[in-house]
UniProtKB/Swiss-Prot annotation:
Pfam families: GatB_N, GatB_Yqey. This is Aspartyl/glutamyl-tRNA(Asn/Gln) amidotransferase subunit B. It catalyses: L-glutamyl-tRNA(Gln) + L-glutamine + ATP + H2O = L-glutaminyl-tRNA(Gln) + L-glutamate + ADP + phosphate + H(+); L-aspartyl-tRNA(Asn) + L-glutamine + ATP + H2O = L-asparaginyl-tRNA(Asn) + L-glutamate + ADP + phosphate + 2 H(+). Disulfide bonds: none annotated. It comes from the Bacteria. Heterotrimer of A, B and C subunits. Allows the formation of correctly charged Asn-tRNA(Asn) or Gln-tRNA(Gln) through the transamidation of misacylated Asp-tRNA(Asn) or Glu-tRNA(Gln) in organisms which lack either or both of asparaginyl-tRNA or glutaminyl-tRNA synthetases. The reaction takes place in the presence of glutamine and ATP through an activated phospho-Asp-tRNA(Asn) or phospho-Glu-tRNA(Gln). It comes from Bacillus cereus (strain ATCC 14579 / DSM 31 / CCUG 7414 / JCM 2152 / NBRC 15305 / NCIMB 9373 / NCTC 2599 / NRRL B-3711). GO terms for biological process: glutaminyl-tRNAGln biosynthesis via transamidation; translation. Belongs to the GatB/GatE family. GatB subfamily.
Amino acid sequence: MNLETIIGLEVHVELKTNSKIFSASPTEFGAEPNTQTSVIDLGYPGVLPTLNKEAVNFAMKAAMALNCEIATETKFDRKNYFYPDNPKAYQISQFDKPIGENGWIEIEVDGKKKRIGITRLHLEEDAGKSTHTADGSLVDYNRQGMPLIEIVSEPDMRTPEEAYAYLEKLKSIIQYTGVSDCKMEEGSLRCDANISLRPVGQEKFGTKAELKNLNSFTYVQKGLEHEQVRQEKELLSGGIIQQETRRYDEATKKTILMRVKEGSDDYRYFPEPDLVELYIDDEWKEAVRASIPELPDARKARYVAELGLPAYDAHVLTLTKEMSDFFEATVADGADAKLTSNWLMGEVLAYLNKQQKELKDVALTPAGLSKMVQLIEKGTISSKIAKKVFNELIEKGGDPEEIVKAKGLVQISDEGTLRKVVTEILDNNEQSIEDFKNGKDRAIGFLVGQIMKATKGQANPPLVNKILLEEINKR
């Protein structure tokens, strides 16, 4: 029996508003527990929620960027459940009239493009955060009432790799709109995954498992990969899949049962009586649409068409808005686009990945990188020397020209000076000359290495090659 994997994702994104969705409480991350809450957030008797218009604008902006149809009439509902981090015993969410529906995004895996549908995007408030210790449980209500959008995908993904690509693309689009920073480590992007298997050709879905507590895109992919194998083994051996909630455990690299779900959750939704229905007219929609900046796909296409970058470069540079904006600013300052791309995709990304940092955390600036790239273009420094300058720029900042002068790194491009060095090297390496003339091309590499060593890496490489061949041919 051949089985097909069905994957759908539910993503919660915290909106970057200055105040909460139904109160004036601040939303700053990392504050002392229970210092950013109010009687409205905690559901004291007699208090009334007031809808944050900016949260609605942000939700509309995200929905439009995800190609959703925007509702003209939308409303809020009470989702009823009891849990210690939910002080009101209900959550204000949206049930049957979400703010956005029928959207899609396009992903690419192994060179193949695929459209993934988005069922709905709705607004809701976040719950508090429980922390369980050996002495008991603690609840921090700072997060209670934070504005969220929940983005529910269609079950269109067939592999864990597609799920990873979907999350990357979704995060990128949301970050470009500016409505959220999407930092999983701070809880501003969270993901639950649903996965089931069915015989190829069967219309009906199999019984799904829900994966929770997935704190990185890599964990989402790994969790789905394991669950895919677990369910396949169970089904092929004649077993039955139960509807379960599971979590991915990195230590064992397995999904672990959290609870068995005997039926669908009944949250007894009913319309929120303290909030009127919301009417979104065309004028409001168009005002929000006009505020949407250039999105990653459009920016990627522009890099290829206008800057002549390879499609791969354009893809990597536009994965995050931070990197793309840095690239744009560097090129706008006069640097060559392809050379800038090479440095960002090479040395810069390697440094950031090794140090586990973001661009905003380092001393390198677009102006600094631009000036360094232009020094390479002019022949003032070689790419090899530039790496020494780069190390200083990214660690301490500064002016590339001043660094070059202070460290004596100016490239030697004087032909007379280099010819003298080349002649001395050849005089001391007659065997290498013979080897080269006898067809051993590696000999030229050895000679170039000796010249670079003699000049402390500061010789102009193209000029060295030219002079070297000229001098060899004279002998």
